[in-house]
């Protein structure tokens, strides 16, 4: 990938989170900008929680065209933008912000649509199926919205704090499909009869993390999706699923497709998906 051209006309986009040093988003987006000849640059910005409000104000003041939002800021950013798209409003989480022509901030959620595109590339179709999502934070909420919109028959949410999962279930009302809540201690019960297992927790970000789903739950015919990715290697969950011959949707694929949707919102141009994919695989 060539070094981005930076001059007085360069449009700025980026990523805010804490931490951001592990992120592959800069490589991915800058590869597409270079391939398309767009005068944009994407920069990672480590913004601690206590500086989030000031950080968002600063990005607007500095003329950024948009930015991604990652953990732990996805939910708090909802209150810092001017309006939300439907996916962000229902999920209560923002992963992409676009600066509109009048300078207002549109909070979007492309995690869910990216998740669905990744599933379908891997041959996983949610319609009419039963899915178990571990986690009830921003990523889990976006995935839940996307699954129900895609015709899922039953969604099960397992979370360490049941109150948060119950709040998510309430927000999902009206999207169709049955929604049940389980404590993490009831993970085995929740997984019974599930066709799709989705990890939307932090587990897997660090080497040595326990599997979010015990190996005995990785039954024949189950599809496994991991929202977590580790630069340069598959997560333990994805490796375990593949060893058993199961369909596995890695976090890198979800990252790719949510990024495609985000970049299109910033530039109004279809991204170079091939360049983005090569950058994620280390070939760019």
Swiss-Prot record:
The processes (GO biological process) annotated in the record are: amino acid biosynthetic process; aromatic amino acid family biosynthetic process; chorismate biosynthetic process; shikimate metabolic process
Kindly list the positions annotated as binding NADP(+): 86, 135-139, 159-164, 227, 251
**MF terms in GO:** NADP binding; shikimate 3-dehydrogenase (NADP+) activity
List positions binding shikimate: 23-25, 70, 95, 111, 229
Origin: domain of life = Bacteria
Reaction catalysed by this enzyme: shikimate + NADP(+) = 3-dehydroshikimate + NADPH + H(+)
- To which pathway does this protein belong? Metabolic intermediate biosynthesis; chorismate biosynthesis; chorismate from D-erythrose 4-phosphate and phosphoenolpyruvate: step 4/7
Asked if the keyword Secreted belongs to this entry, the reply reads: no
What SUPFAM superfamilies is this protein classified in? Aminoacid dehydrogenase-like, N-terminal domain (SSF53223), NAD(P)-binding Rossmann-fold domains (SSF51735)
Provide the E.C. number(s) assigned to this enzyme.
1.1.1.25
Q: Which residues are the active-site ones?
A: 74
Q: What keywords sit in the KW lines?
A: Amino-acid biosynthesis, Aromatic amino acid biosynthesis, NADP, Oxidoreductase
Q: Does the keyword NADP apply?
A: yes
Could you say which protein family the record assigns here?
A: Belongs to the shikimate dehydrogenase family.
Task: Fetch the HAMAP family from UniProt.
Answer: Shikimate_DH_AroE (MF_00222)
Subunit notes for this chain? Homodimer.
Q: Which function does this protein serve?
A: Involved in the biosynthesis of the chorismate, which leads to the biosynthesis of aromatic amino acids. Catalyzes the reversible NADPH linked reduction of 3-dehydroshikimate (DHSA) to yield shikimate (SA).
Q: Which NCBIfam families match?
A: aroE (TIGR00507), PRK00258.3-3 (NF001319)
Q: What protein name is recorded for this chain?
A: Shikimate dehydrogenase (NADP(+))
The primary gene name is: aroE
